[in-house]
Amino acid sequence: SWPNRDRFVLSAGHGSILVYSLLHLTGYDLSLEELKEFRQLGSRTPGHPEYGLTPGVETTTGPLGQGFANGVGLAIAERFLAATFNRPEFPIFDHYTYAIVSDGDLMEGISHEAASLAGHLGLDKLVNLYGDNEISIEGKAMITFTEDVPGRFRAYGWYVEEINGDDLEAIEHAIRSAQGETERPSLIVCHTHIAYGSPNKQDAAAAHGAPLGDEEVRRTKEKLDWPSEAKFWVPEEALMVFREAVENGQQTQTSLLNLVERYAAVYPDEAALLGRLWEG
């Protein structure tokens, strides 16, 4: 709810449980019991993220391509706010917009138009991670989708990097490279495996939009050296890492809000206008 936070858009909205899990781990008002109500009528963990229903969700997504365009719009908003209100000693708007996008998103016409505009405007604060697992609900994505996605985005004027999307260090390195861009939006092509670690369903269309099943889940956990019988279990050391990240984020938030207070003291008219815009 504070102005200069980074934005995150899950354009591939069908992967909503990823967002809900991270919101829970990072201390948002979303309990473990609510995660267990995933996709149930009346729950705060619906099958696609919904703005205003689940704390921490920036925008509703689901219709393919919509989230991609939402991300471009958010990046344009950051550019506008920075150009309007920033002063040399007060960079009160300099946040990033991150999005996870899918094959289905990039098939849709709206993503083509939005990507072209983002490249034209040079939205350097926009970083999209494209989950390229080469699978659709019908089978291999190549049945209907064979275009050169990296080449298309380079033609739009984007920075493009291709990585192993199952390698966390590679993802971090690519994001940092994208943050170094000052004139182009970024597309990180993450080559991944659907149902990663599943002995029988990895890289199979059967894992698209359907549960693995209890037995396959057990086998997958065993293959990944995870306690096979535990459900909704988070290792204590992992929880500590997330809690440390929350503390760091809170410190960053406090620092940036203090910057806005100092800005208001020096530029009261601009701060008043910003307040009116923020209140709608």
Where do the language-model regions lie?
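Thiamine diphosphate
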Residues: 1-98, 240, 244-280
